[in-house]
Design a protein with these regions (language model features):
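N- and C-terminal low-complexity/disordered segments
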Residues: 2-7, 11, 20-125
Length: 125
């Protein structure tokens, strides 16, 4: 019984911190700052992407659906909801990634592509 109470307490503490982190990303912005790596040339490019506008990086097309960041008084964090498509001439459009990317943890939800990597740097006002 004592273990069950301890487990319940630990779960409650975890949920309290987790829910606070989710709600702290409260400032919505209109532009995401992204970086892309071309693995063939080893070149890193930094580019801005406005909400719901297509931005090209190599054969990729990146669309930012939402970009949020924490208020200045909290630990810095930015997250963007992205849709990344691969556009190859003469082939159908392929959606490579749809989901949230976090600036502090780019490997948490990474896009898989043999030539390119894309990650979030931050959200701009």
């Amino acid at each position: 019984m004592k273990r069950a109470v301890q487990f319940f307490f630990v779960c409650q503490v975890f949920l309290a911190f987790a829910s606070g982190a989710v709600h702290s990303l409260s400032i919505e912005t209109g532009t995401a700052l992204l970086q892309g790596l071309d693995k063939v040339t080893a070149r890193v490019s930094t580019f801005e992407a406005n909400l719901n506008q297509e931005v090209r990086f190599g054969t990729l097309e990146v669309i930012v659906k939402k970009c949020v960041k924490t208020p200045p008084e909290e630990t810095p964090e930015s997250a963007a909801f992205l849709e990344i498509r691969d556009i190859k001439p003469g082939q159908d459009l392929e959606i490579l990634f749809t989901g949230w990317m976090f600036a502090s943890s780019p490997s948490l939800s990474a896009m898989q592509h043999p030539v390119y990597d894309v990650w979030v740097i931050g959200c701009l006002d």
